[in-house]
């Protein structure tokens, strides 16, 4: 059992705490699921891009799914090889494209004809041939939160099959483009196997037709991964997920690329916070803690529910419903409504669970609140993997603007 009290003697709340053994096992589970087939697991940095987490995954052989030049540079800094990096995203700038091509990453996932032509122009100016993949929008409902559904025709992502074919043929004729992969990503937090299997089958058929047209595909890039059980939902078994993809690729000699993020890191993380006050208003009980929505946005943005565990021993205290809220000046700064928790006192410690994904990576300095300390638990030892920002860090990049005023 982990001794939190020793931790609290050294580190002040709030802070993130990650169990690196859980991250390692989650990644190895993906490798095992695709064992026996040429595959590359490209961790999606958007879930959590802490350098120490990336370094851990790099040492396990991970690639990287990146959506900005900043993420690409983070991946490289952590030791992920350029030939294991794919660059996705609907709005890559010309600067980002040029930098990615100069770094000789594995390929760029292209999301529009205009982007394809931009890549061609930049590749020509560099005198190189750009490896590209085209993201196909299969128009399949992922049955997930609408904010993270990405595979329907009304979503901004990817292109329809007809346009994809035109883009592949254009790229095939170009002296500066090399089409090497097909790509699709229907959404995040998938809890139903059928949509991902259907999408895989549909895009696999497209891949076969492209190969028949003489396009030398080498990769089959499946965006995303399986969902996480935040509220005791039934989740997809990783073996079934992998088999659904593998079965769709019968007759195709392509390397599978899988891009999990949430399912690698979510369950590893806790946000440790302490009670500041309790109050009642209109018979409503509020527990006010020192972490805020700027530190962990998912409950406010997606109405996501994360279990909250009381760390401080509270035996014998009366249990009743309460809203656990933060100090930010927004009514949406609420971590959990109607949580059944014991009567709490200032200084009592709580853990908000399964926050390893889309926690620190979505954090901000809203209300001029410094970003949090991040700790890793590895081999029964604690180490700092991100220092807490100082107050001075809030305005460090603005000081020059005061000169001469």
Swiss-Prot record:
Residues that bear N6-(pyridoxal phosphate)lysine: 46
Top-level taxonomic group: Bacteria
Pfam families hit by this protein: Orn_Arg_deC_N (PF02784), Orn_DAP_Arg_deC (PF00278)
BP term (GO), one: lysine biosynthetic process via diaminopimelate
Catalytic residues as annotated in Swiss-Prot or TrEMBL: 329 (proton donor)
Enzyme nomenclature, EC number: 4.1.1.20
Reaction it catalyzes: meso-2,6-diaminopimelate + H(+) = L-lysine + CO2
Residues noted as binding substrate in the record, renumbered to the chain: 262, 298, 302, 330, 358
Keyword Lyase annotated: yes
Coiled coil: none
GO function terms (MF aspect): diaminopimelate decarboxylase activity; pyridoxal phosphate binding
Annotated metabolic or biological route of this protein: Amino-acid biosynthesis; L-lysine biosynthesis via DAP pathway; L-lysine from DL-2,6-diaminopimelate: step 1/1
Keywords on record: Amino-acid biosynthesis, Decarboxylase, Lyase, Lysine biosynthesis, Pyridoxal phosphate
Binding site for pyridoxal 5'-phosphate: 225, 259-262, 358
Cofactor: pyridoxal 5'-phosphate
Job description of the protein: Specifically catalyzes the decarboxylation of meso-diaminopimelate (meso-DAP) to L-lysine.
Family designation: Belongs to the Orn/Lys/Arg decarboxylase class-II family. LysA subfamily.
Quaternary structure (record): Homodimer.
PANTHER family: DIAMINOPIMELATE DECARBOXYLASE, GROUP IV DECARBOXYLASE
HAMAP family, sorted: LysA
Name of the featured protein: Diaminopimelate decarboxylase
């Amino acid at each position: 059992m982990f001794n939190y009290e020793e931790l609290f003697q050294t580190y002040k709340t709030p802070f993130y705490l990650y169990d690196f053994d859980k991250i390692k096992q989650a990644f190895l589970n993906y490798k095992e699921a695709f064992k026996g087939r040429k595959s590359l697991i490209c961790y999606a940095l958007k879930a959590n891009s802490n350098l120490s987490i990336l370094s851990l995954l790099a040492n396990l052989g991970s690639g990287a799914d990146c959506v900005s030049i900043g993420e690409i540079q983070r991946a490289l800094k952590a030791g992920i090889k350029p030939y294991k990096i794919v660059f996705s995203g609907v709005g890559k700038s010309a600067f980002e494209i040029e930098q990615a091509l100069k770094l000789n990453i594995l390929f760029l996932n292209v999301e529009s004809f205009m982007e394809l032509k931009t890549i061609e122009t930049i590749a020509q100016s560099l005198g190189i041939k750009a490896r590209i993949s085209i993201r196909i929008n299969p128009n399949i409902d992922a049955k997930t939160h609408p904010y993270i559904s990405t595979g329907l025709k009304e979503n901004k992502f990817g292109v329809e099959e007809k346009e994809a074919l035109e883009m592949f043929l254009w790229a095939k004729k170009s002296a500066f483009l090399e089409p090497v992969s097909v790509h699709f990503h229907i959404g995040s937090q998938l809890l139903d196997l059928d949509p991902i299997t259907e999408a895989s089958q549909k895009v696999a058929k497209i891949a076969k037709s492209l190969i028949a047209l003489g396009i030398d595909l080498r990769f089959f890039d499946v965006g995303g991964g399986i969902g996480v059980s935040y509220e005791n939902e039934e989740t997809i078994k990783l073996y079934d997920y992998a088999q659904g993809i593998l079965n769709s690729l019968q007759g195709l000699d392509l390397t599978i690329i899988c891009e999990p993020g949430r399912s690698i890191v979510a369950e590893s993380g806790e946000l440790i916070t302490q009670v500041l006050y309790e109050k009642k208003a209109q018979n409503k009980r509020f527990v006010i803690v020192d972490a805020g929505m700027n530190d962990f946005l998912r409950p406010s943005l997606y109405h996501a529910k994360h279990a909250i565990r009381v760390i401080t021993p509270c035996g014998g205290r009366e249990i009743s419903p309460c809203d656990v809220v933060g100090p930010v000046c927004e009514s949406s700064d609420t971590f959990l409504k109607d949580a059944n928790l014991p009567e709490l006192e200032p200084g009592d410690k709580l853990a908000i669970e399964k926050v390893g994904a889309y926690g620190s990576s979505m954090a901000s300095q809203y209300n001029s609140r410094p970003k949090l300390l991040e700790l890793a638990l590895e081999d029964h030892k604690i180490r700092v993997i991100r220092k807490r920002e100082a107050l001075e860090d809030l305005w460090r990049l603005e000081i020059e603007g005061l000169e001469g005023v």
